[in-house]
């Protein structure tokens, strides 16, 4: 009898939960339609994997890519609509958030072709890999639209948990296991620090969790200049710092880049920074509106340390992936300049434009690392010597992406940095921009050093890896080369038409 009553209560509770979820989707589903497409894609992947055999593997890639492209399309159709707040204030839809969601979807769409041949060669489980990538993308999209402290804490956990699993996907590799352990420990510590900072905001604002309501609560309680807000600022900056990985919160980055599967590194190198930048800009601008001088100073210190340490340490690296890890630390220093400038002087527009170019430059470089690693089994920088003699297309594509990362004209990276630094200069960040210019020159040195190795024709300098280099049949690598071509074009052509891109970003944001 007791069991029967408990069973009925369980059914009633489950029914209420289901009806509430159905009600939320019915009345708020249009606000998260791009996210719903990804959820539907995840369900399809699970259904096909559980009911089919190995012959249906191409369908898994097709469904993953199609769901991402359809999500991008839904996002573009919703462009320029009026800002909307849904799910009782937990989620906000506006042009600013949608731009970051578009960048995350673009990253994932370009990363899936990079993983096709790699997964086949390493015999990794395909379905789980695609599920983790799509779920991480979904978490990043929810993070971009988060409008309260709880969602800002929960959404990155969805992204982070999938990132931990992806970084340790090659479980037989000792380096991958070590990278996952460090990533998990550092990620868990940063999450606890972040939520502790939110607890200070919650208490100081009188129990508010929505970002704008936190500001109103701080005004009502007269706590906007209290020591508690300073403590919250420090903890939240540290928590977000571990997600963005600027110096000195970069300790996990080189090991994770070196030990994780290369397609995973390509995915994490761009999506993690885009996903963390969106809430960072909103948190600093809204709840800490009255502490702008303090957080400007904190971010300036982080930017300077990142640009100097990242680019100087990158010079000494012998592994291509570790070099790109330290390079990414320097790159986030440039992005922080745009966060500091903010709405004034087109800071956000220049930051978003540079992020768009950075995605193409970085993914193009990682596409080359994936191809070279599969054909030679190494990512040592010295082993790239003489690659031009064996594979001119791969060498030239790599050179263009590296030159664009260094910021040489007339490539996209040059114009992206130029506009970003110009916005910083107009905002009075003279010292910060000067450091950025100097460290950009330093980065050009180690990028040119790699290009020199790629183009060398001296037989005594060509390594055995390149001598034995054999191109795979075009059928097996066309997806990687297709992604590389797209990234190379995006790293070069937009530099010529920079003004229209900046104008579109400015017109969309403001």
From Swiss-Prot:
Predominant place of localization: plastid
* GO MF assignments: NADH dehydrogenase (ubiquinone) activity; quinone binding
**Catalytic function, reaction form:** a plastoquinone + NADH + (n+1) H(+)(in) = a plastoquinol + NAD(+) + n H(+)(out); a plastoquinone + NADPH + (n+1) H(+)(in) = a plastoquinol + NADP(+) + n H(+)(out)
Coiled-coil stretches noted in the UniProt entry, renumbered to this chain? none
Alphabetical keyword list: Chloroplast, Membrane, NAD, NADP, Plastid, Plastoquinone, Quinone, Thylakoid, Translocase, Transmembrane, Transmembrane helix, Transport
| Keyword match 4Fe-4S | no
Give the matching InterPro entries.
Answer: NADH-Q_OxRdtase_suN/2 (IPR010096), ND/Mrp_TM (IPR001750), Ndh2_N (IPR045693)
Report the EC code(s) recorded for this entry.
7.1.1.-
Source domain of life is Eukaryota
**What pairs make up the disulfide bonds?**
none
Location in the cell reads: Plastid, Chloroplast thylakoid membrane
What the record says about family reads: Belongs to the complex I subunit 2 family.
**Job description of the protein:** NDH shuttles electrons from NAD(P)H:plastoquinone, via FMN and iron-sulfur (Fe-S) centers, to quinones in the photosynthetic chain and possibly in a chloroplast respiratory chain. The immediate electron acceptor for the enzyme in this species is believed to be plastoquinone. Couples the redox reaction to proton translocation, and thus conserves the redox energy in a proton gradient.
Task: List the PANTHER family hit by this protein, alphabetically.
Answer: NADH DEHYDROGENASE (PTHR22773)
Assembly and interactions? NDH is composed of at least 16 different subunits, 5 of which are encoded in the nucleus.
Q: Under what name is this protein listed?
A: NAD(P)H-quinone oxidoreductase subunit 2 A, chloroplastic
Q: Which organism is it from?
A: Drimys granadensis
Query: Highest lineage ranks of the organism?
Result: Eukaryota, Viridiplantae, Streptophyta, Embryophyta, Tracheophyta
């Amino acid at each position: 009898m007791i069991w029967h009553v408990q069973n009925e209560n369980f059914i009633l509770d489950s029914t209420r939960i289901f009806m509430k979820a159905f009600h939320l989707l019915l009345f708020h589903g249009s606000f998260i339609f791009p996210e719903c497409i990804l959820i539907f894609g995840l369900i399809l992947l699970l259904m096909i994997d559980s009911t089919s055999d190995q012959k249906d593997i191409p369908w898994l890639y097709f469904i993953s890519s199609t769901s991402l492209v359809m999500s991008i399309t839904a996002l573009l159709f919703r462009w320029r609509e009026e800002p909307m707040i849904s799910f009782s204030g937990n989620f906000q839809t506006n042009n600013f958030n949608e731009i970051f969601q578009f960048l995350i979807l673009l990253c994932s769409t370009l990363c899936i072709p990079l993983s096709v041949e790699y997964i086949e060669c390493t015999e990794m489980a395909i379905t789980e890999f695609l599920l983790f990538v799509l779920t991480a993308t979904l978490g990043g999209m929810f993070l971009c639209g988060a409008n309260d402290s709880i969602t800002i804490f929960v959404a990155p956990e969805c992204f982070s948990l999938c990132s931990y699993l992806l970084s340790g996907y090659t479980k037989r590799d000792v380096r991958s296991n070590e990278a996952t352990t460090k990533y998990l420990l550092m990620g868990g510590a940063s999450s606890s620090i972040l939520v502790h900072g939110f607890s200070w905001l919650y208490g100081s604002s009188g129990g508010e969790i929505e970002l704008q309501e936190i500001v109103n609560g701080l005004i009502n309680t007269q706590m906007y200049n209290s020591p508690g807000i300073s403590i919250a600022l420090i903890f939240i900056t540290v928590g977000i710092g571990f997600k963005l990985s600027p110096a000195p919160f970069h300790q996990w980055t080189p090991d994770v880049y070196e030990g994780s599967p290369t397609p995973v590194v390509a995915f994490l190198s761009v999506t993690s920074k885009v996903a963390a930048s969106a809430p960072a800009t909103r948190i600093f601008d809204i709840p800490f509106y009255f502490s702008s001088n303090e957080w400007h100073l904190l971010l300036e210190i982080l930017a300077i340390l990142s640009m100097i340490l990242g680019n100087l340490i990158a010079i000494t690296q012998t592994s291509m992936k570790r070099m790109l890890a330290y390079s990414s630390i320097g790159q986030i220093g440039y992005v922080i300049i745009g966060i500091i400038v903010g709405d004034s002087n087109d800071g956000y527009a220049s930051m978003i434009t540079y992020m768009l170019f950075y995605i193409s430059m970085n993914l193009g470089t990682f596409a080359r690392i994936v191809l070279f690693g599969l054909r030679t089994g190494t990512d040592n920088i010295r082993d790239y010597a003489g690659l031009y003699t064996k594979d001119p297309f791969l060498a030239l594509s790599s050179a263009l992406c590296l030159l664009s990362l260094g910021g040489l004209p007339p490539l996209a990276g040059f114009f992206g940095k130029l506009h970003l630094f110009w916005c910083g200069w107009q905002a009075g960040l003279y010292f910060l921009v000067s450091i950025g210019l100097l460290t950009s020159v330093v980065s050009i040195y180690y990028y040119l050093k790699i290009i020199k190795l790629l183009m060398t024709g001296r037989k005594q300098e060509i390594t055995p890896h390149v001598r034995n280099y054999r191109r795979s049949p075009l059928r097996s690598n066309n997806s990687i080369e297709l992604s590389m071509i797209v990234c190379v074009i995006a790293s070069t052509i937009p530099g010529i038409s920079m003004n229209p891109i900046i104008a579109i970003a400015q017109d969309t944001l403001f």
